[in-house]
Amino acid sequence: MESVALLQRPSQAPSASALASESARPLADGLIKSPKPLMKKQAVKRHHHKHNLRHRYEFLETLGKGTYGKVKKARESSGRLVAIKSIRKDKIKDEQDLLHIRREIEIMSSLNHPHIIAIHEVGRSRLVTVFENSSKIVIVMEYASRGDLYDYISERPRLSERDARHFFRQIVSALHYCHQNGIVHRDLKLENILLDANGNIKIADFGLSNLYHKGKFLQTFCGSPLYASPEIVNGKPYVGPEVDSWSLGVLLYILVHGTMPFDGQDHKTLVKQISNGAYREPPKPSDACGLIRWLLMVNPTRRATLEDVASHWWVNWGYTTGVGEQEALREGGHPSGDFGRASMADWLRRSSRPLLENGAKVCSFFKQHVPGGGSTVPGLERQHSLKKSRKENDMAQNLQGDPAEDTSSRPGKSSLKLPKGILKKKSSTSSGEVQEDPQELRPVPDTPGQPVPAVSLLPRKGILKKSRQRESGYYSSPEPSESGELLDASDVFVSGDPVEQKSPQASGLLLHRKGILKLNGKFSRTALEGTTPSTFGSLDQLASSHPAARPSRPSGAVSEDSILSSESFDQLDLPERLPETPLRGCVSVDNLRGLEQPPSEGLKRWWQESLGDSCFSLTDCQEVTAAYRQALGICSKLS
């Protein structure tokens, strides 16, 4: 039996040159000996005996397809249903792709949470079922029988606040667990949130996930534009958790209001809305509006963290145990059953803005959960109107230091103000009810007399793409394609403050990577095709580094039942998960994933337009990507 152990993270961070040399090391040993993320020490083992998948599983329908392969529903001999993801090696274009797959497998196999999709375990030995042969990598995963949250919301007029809170708490619990273990997901969206047979959340697709370090920055611009944070769309380095917090705010808005917060009809409008935090003010405000506003803060230093969300009053309303306390209980801690005075005071300090907007319910919540109610703590009924959080006290300083927000002084306005584009509540009618005007869904312009652009009311489910064009949550992340469209480039760790990028001059200097999309750069697919192999060989040795000729038959000629072939597979085992041991950080790698789209006649590709003086930012794209056009297609038809 061959065993390859993962290296422990060194006590001191390696230098940038060491990281570069490590990432550039030739890959020649397949998935078993590919470069590995530096996580907790564990081993990847290969058995000498072979496995025939046809004898082991009964394959049923296809759940989803991606660039690398497909996901099939299958039934094992015990009767248990599983989801089997097959990855064809001839679809893996370069070393970074294989490294990316390796990282996804090891991150998923290391996580152990009830609301995260699990790689299937065999019996009580907790062996991860991953198979590999000369042409395929096969991953056996947990099957979520009720589809994804996208379909669940589509089938219902609107979720009740109770149901929205139920789903949101489970999402927060899983994401909080990831952040505690140093993992950032970076692709949170409805399609990647599955539901099991009991209607519980299962977060899937860790294809764009990575490990992060405090004090260091990532520079991978990835994920869906509709869920992307201002740092992502503007090409700014980020630590990691703050981009998940933004996506969490978008998800909460969808769960509560049934539509997308940002509805730009093109990329420039969308980026402007996201950069200003100008989300659509709902006609019927919810009690969750304060938390949504906190999560959709443009300044990442003022944005709510997962700890803030886990202890927020709206998330824990009606529950005797907070989300953070549930995590402590699951890890073997002994927290109190209810919020005590100390935790309540800490919660008050971090949640002053929601308290100001929902004072009555907060006082009721405090009396309900603190022994003795308001009688034991005098003056707390008015405490929420007097106390300010540290985030709010530092608002003016943060605004001055944040380039993502408009800090220009305006006459007659205080220096302590909300970020530009954060919508104010609509004026009430004489009866005290909020006026529901579908035309007044845009932010009110700051300049007096400036007309408000008329916007037609989008349907509640305008965010949803056609079901036949969507991919499964097991395979929904953008994956490499030959179109040259990339939604993410390489991960780079930057110590200290990010270096400010200067705008290009008109002299035609070389433009560097910035923003979501990039044209034919050193990280683009077209640049890699001439220097990297197009296919991989056997399990233990990949093909030569010289470019290989394309196969004579198209990929579509591969049989639909190719996964059911009589080929023998080697089983790769990962040992038992150790939830009590924190995951170790790792050097991030290049994420070379693109959005596959067939060329359409009569529609000019975005890179055919004149880029002018752009920096390859998302704002320079004259045409939307395929995913965004599909997302808005049904919106325009139904409106």
Curated annotation (Swiss-Prot):
PTM per Swiss-Prot/TrEMBL: Phosphorylated at Thr-220 by STK11/LKB1 in complex with STE20-related adapter-alpha (STRADA) pseudo kinase and CAB39. Autophosphorylation is also possible at Thr-220.
Residue numbers bearing the Phosphothreonine modification: 220
Domain of life: Eukaryota
Pfam families xref list: Pkinase
Cofactor section: Mg(2+)
Reaction(s) this enzyme catalyzes, per UniProt: L-seryl-[protein] + ATP = O-phospho-L-seryl-[protein] + ADP + H(+); L-threonyl-[protein] + ATP = O-phospho-L-threonyl-[protein] + ADP + H(+)
GO biological process, one term: actin cytoskeleton organization
Transmembrane segments: none
Enzyme class label: transferase
Biased composition (Polar residues): 529-542
Annotated GO MF terms: ATP binding; magnesium ion binding; protein serine kinase activity; protein serine/threonine kinase activity
EC number per UniProt: 2.7.11.1
Entry keyword Kinase: yes
Keywords of this entry: Acetylation, Apoptosis, ATP-binding, Kinase, Magnesium, Metal-binding, Nucleotide-binding, Phosphoprotein, Serine/threonine-protein kinase, Transferase
Residue spans of biased composition, Low complexity class: 7-21, 472-484, 543-557
Activity regulation annotation text: Activated by phosphorylation on Thr-220.
Phosphoserine PTM sites in chain numbering: 538, 559, 562, 588
InterPro entries: Kinase-like_dom_sf, Prot_kinase_dom, Protein_kinase_ATP_BS, Ser/Thr_kinase_AS
Binding site for ATP: 63-71, 85
Stretch list, region Disordered: 1-21, 372-485, 529-575
PANTHER family: MAP/MICROTUBULE AFFINITY-REGULATING KINASE (PTHR24346), NUAK FAMILY SNF1-LIKE KINASE 1 (PTHR24346:SF93)
Family: Belongs to the protein kinase superfamily. CAMK Ser/Thr protein kinase family. SNF1 subfamily.
Role: Stress-activated kinase involved in tolerance to glucose starvation. Induces cell-cell detachment by increasing F-actin conversion to G-actin. Expression is induced by CD95 or TNF-alpha, via NF-kappa-B. Protects cells from CD95-mediated apoptosis and is required for the increased motility and invasiveness of CD95-activated tumor cells. Phosphorylates LATS1 and LATS2. Plays a key role in neural tube closure during embryonic development through LATS2 phosphorylation and regulation of the nuclear localization of YAP1 a critical downstream regulatory target in the Hippo signaling pathway.
Protein name: NUAK family SNF1-like kinase 2
The organism of origin for this protein: Mus musculus (Mouse)
Gene: Nuak2
